[in-house]
Every structure is written in C-alpha cells, then in structure tokens.
Amino acid sequence: MKVLVLNCGSSSVKYKLLEMPKGDVLAQGGVEKLGLPGSFLKLTMPNGEKVVLEKDMPEHTIAVEFILSVLKDDKYGCIKSYEEIDAVGHRLVHGGEKFSNSVEITPEVIAKVEECIPLAPLHNPANLKGVVAIEKLLPGIRQVGVFDTAFFQTMPEHVYRYALPYDMCNKHGVRRYGFHGTSHRYVSARACEILGLDYDKTRIITAHIGNGASIAAIKNGKALDVSLGMTPVEGLMMGTRSGDVDPGVLTFLMEAEGLEAAGISELINKKSGVLGVSGVSSDMREIEDAIKNGNERATLAMTMYDYRIKKYVGAYAAAMGGVDVLVFTGGVGENQYTTREKVCTDMEFMGIVFDSKVNEGMRGKEMVISKPESKVTVIVVPTDEEYMIASDTMTILK
C-alpha cells in the first residue's frame, strides 16, 4: 500500500511517499517559500542527492500539484500513475477536544477541524488547504487526518485544567492540549519495541527536543501529562519561545513597554527562548560555537535550556511514581550529546546510570545510552512522524 503523507504549513508543504506496512520511503521532499517570491521544491533522491526545482507556487493547490507531477516525473519520480497512490495521510495540528484518534477525512471531519481554527489560527487553515488540494487533484482518493493533539486527550482533568475561572475556561476551550503527540506516540512505542517491554505496563518520559520542544509522561500506554499547553509556548525553553514564565511578567511588560496583546505574543513566540537570552541565535549549533568562543550569554542560555529539561524529567517521574524509560528525540535530542549528558548527570538517585562514553559517540540513530545496571533505560529514538501518519492511514482504511 502506497501512502502519501502531507504536512502543509502556511508557507511550506512537506511530503513523503511510503510503501506500507514496511515503511520504505519511496520519495520525500518539501516546498518552501510557498506564496512568496523564489518558491522551490527540494527533494531527496534515493541515493541521498538533494535536488532543488524552482517554480512559482502562489498557493497550496499549485504546490501539491507540482509535488504530484514530480512523483510521476521520468527523471525524479517513482510512480507511473497516480492510481498507484492508495491513500493520503495528513498532519492536522489541532483537533481540540473533538478528536482523540486519527480519522478518515469526511465533510463532517473538515467542519469540526474548521471549528478548531481559533485554537490554531496559523496551522489548521493551512492543513485543510492540503486536504482540499488532494480532493481536487486526486478525486475519490481516501484521506486520513492525524492530529498532533489527539494523543493527549487521555490526560485527566486535574492535569489538563488550568487554575483559572472554571466557566470562563469552558466557554473559550481554555485547557492544556499538548502538541508533538504523533512524535511522542511513535518514539514511546518504538522504545518499548526495541527494549522488549510491554507498552501498556511501562512508565515512559519522552523528550522531543528541537527548535520547538516538549516532554511527555506516558504511563501504561496513555499520555498522563505534557509540557506544552493550550499553545506551543508553555513548558521548556525553546529556540525562540519562552516556555514557562510567570504570567504576571507579561502584564508587567505590557505596561512597562507599552505592548498590546499582539506585541506580547510576538515577544514570547519569536523573540524569547535561546535567541532572547543568548542574543546570538535560536540554532543550537551556533550557540555551541558561541560557547566555544567564550560567549557568556550563550553559555547561560544553554545552561537554562538543559536545566528546564532536567526539571521536567524529575517532575514527571514523581507524577508517575517512577520511570522505566527515558527517550530522547527531535533534532537536539537525537544529535546533541551535551544536552543529553547534562540532563542525565547526577540522576543516580532516580535510577539513571548514564554511559557518557556511548552517549558522546551517538548521533541520530537508535541507541541505549545508559549502563546495563541502570534501573531506568535511557535511549535515543529518532522520530518518524510520517511513518506514524502512514501507519494510522493504513490501519484506518483497511
């Protein structure tokens, strides 16, 4: 079964064509600068070669149409006919409280996703444009929506509810939703598969650490808690997002700096986090270079970043009454050994006995980085959200 996975953002469309159930990647790439001058499609050939194809793509339907044409292209493609594509799976960011599982996309589902647009005003409209584009370009093909938020619908009310006026929260849908759910679901299940553990009887902490970052507590196969909240700003310090901050600071700054709501939103989403503290960059590779050159603010930013992760690991271990597996994933989690080491150092009291030597040589592959005597297994699992979306698509449509 060939499944095309689409992840449509406001100015990008990422895609992967997978042969299921094995998960072999037949084609992958993405459109960038969609709707802007200089838009292009970057694709990865089977031999790893990167190819850039420039084309004016003012909107999503034209971008998806170009992707489909490249999939069938004699030089760059891998299929002879669009009929070879059996189904399309979409990343849908926000399903609110309406979706606790992946679903086949119908007019009723589209209407419910549209109702969630106020909760994700940038993402949901873009996601739906991909659905509409496929309906137009491949009429009759079945489509499945996989929600970032669905995995966390198992959180109990005392976890997802904020300590704000009860009726006001209900009126506006204010609660913890969590994001990166597809990634947390994949790496937690994959870790148990690698380690030979029963997913439904294991306490797992998953750390999805990249430019955006979140930590989840997964107990006996169900999400118990997650650091991201109603929006993707809460929790860990991120590339440009603040993470946890005293809400009173925001009202103080509104008065002190003369900021309106839009200004505060830009501050905590785009000007804070690692970038805001370091004054250097939101890219951890550039931060590491700055640290080597003696930049004190870059050093401070990195120390804060690592500390926040460690604090959440401890909190979630307490919330679950212990932990059996700690998983690192995401761009930083998979590739930056220094962050993994800082998080896991001096954690013997919690059952973590870390193997610094193995950790230092480990980048971007599945690997246990704790010692055999460690009561908590620490493991790196590269995330594969596209495989998870394709897997859900196959399961639902079978």
Curated annotation (Swiss-Prot):
Keywords: ATP-binding, Cytoplasm, Kinase, Magnesium, Metal-binding, Nucleotide-binding, Transferase. Pfam families: Acetate_kinase (PF00871). Substrate binds at R91. GO terms for biological process: acetate metabolic process; acetyl-CoA biosynthetic process. The active site is at D148. Its EC number is 2.7.2.1. PROSITE patterns: ACETATE_KINASE_1, ACETATE_KINASE_2. GO terms for cellular component: cytoplasm. Pathway: Metabolic intermediate biosynthesis; acetyl-CoA biosynthesis; acetyl-CoA from acetate: step 1/2. This is Acetate kinase.
